[in-house]
């Protein structure tokens, strides 16, 4: 389905600073095929940083993979928690507010596996102001694909949770990055 939308699904680490706090997560994202991230394959990694004055810059290279990467990330997290880096230069004693859900409105791709397609499609259409449900040419009669536009992640999850028996259904939520 991502291909039909002109993109590919990648597991992306996202971090964004807001006045009120920081959002950080690793989640599946539909990336445009025109993005440099869409061409990163196998053991290679890429980081894109966007700054106010420099715009967007990208770093690309081979990752360490598996255990070396995991242990390096773990060590970095422990150092940050223990504040062992140079105090004042990169870190200070200020406590950061961490958002578990993306605090701004975004577009989301949803995939739901259900025996009750018609009922769930009706619920989705009632719950969201702007939604597009793909009902034709789907891969399976038991799956629903939809794009929900302009929703905060927390609101999206709460609305989906209000669908009867949603906890029993296999639901995948993917950030749609244009």
Where are each of the predicted segments found?
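Substrate-binding/catalytic subdomain of NAD(P)-dependent oxidoreductase enzymes
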Residues: 1-39, 44-46
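Active-site proximal loops enriched in glycine and acidic residues that flank catalytic Cys/His/Asp
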Residues: 13-14, 28, 51, 61-63, ...
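Active-site lining segments that contact anionic ligands and/or coordinate catalytic metals
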Residues: 21-23, 44-46, 54, 105-109, ...
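Low-complexity, glycine/alanine/valine/leucine- and proline-rich hydrophobic stretches
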Residues: 27-52, 66-67, 128-140
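Short, glycine-/Ser/Thr-/acidic-enriched flexible segments
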Residues: 31-32, 53-55, 63-66, 115-117, ...
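ATP-dependent carboxylate/acyl-activation modules
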Residues: 39-88, 98-105
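A conserved regulatory-domain signal marking ACT and ACT-like small-molecule sensing domains
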Residues: 77-178
């Amino acid at each position: 389905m991502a291909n039909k939308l002109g993109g590919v699904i990648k597991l992306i680490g996202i971090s964004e600073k807001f006045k009120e706090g920081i959002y950080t997560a690793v989640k599946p994202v539909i990336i445009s095929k025109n993005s440099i991230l869409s061409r990163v394959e196998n053991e290679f990694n890429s980081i894109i940083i966007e700054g106010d004055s420099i715009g967007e810059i990208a770093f690309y290279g081979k990752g360490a993979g598996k255990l070396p990467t995991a242990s390096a990330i773990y060590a970095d997290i422990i150092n940050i928690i223990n504040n062992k880096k140079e105090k004042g230069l990169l870190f200070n004693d200020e406590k950061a507010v961490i958002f578990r859900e993306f605090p701004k409105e975004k577009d989301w791709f949803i995939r739901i596996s259900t025996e009750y397609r018609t009922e769930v499609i009706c619920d989705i259409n009632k719950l969201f102001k702007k939604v597009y449900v793909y009902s034709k040419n789907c891969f399976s009669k038991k799956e629903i694909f939809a794009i929900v536009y302009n929703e905060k992640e927390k609101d999206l999850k709460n609305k989906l949770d209000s669908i009867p028996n949603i906890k029993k259904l296999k639901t995948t939520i993917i950030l749609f990055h244009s």
